[in-house]
Amino acid sequence: MKATIVIPNINGKGWLKDSIESVYAQTEQDFELIVVDNGSTDESLEQARGYCTRPNFTLIENGYNTGFSHAVNQGIARARSEFVVLFNNDAFAE
């Protein structure tokens, strides 16, 4: 696996799904995608759960907001590749 993409999320309903879809739309598919949800109260957690059957997708659910840095570190700790790419939940891969 070439890279791990970590997306910390809290209440990203308006962007998260498009961000995830932009990653899966890439021609290079040798990656894993980790979304770390920090206690979202909108529908973004449910959006992320919809991807749990996708290959190389991991969802970490925190029941409360642990903070951005902690969420990023959780994602990095679960990474299985040498390289980690940090995405915000409103970032889109082109």
Protein language model features and the residues they cover:
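A conserved acidic beta->alpha catalytic loop
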Residues: S22, D37-E46, Y64
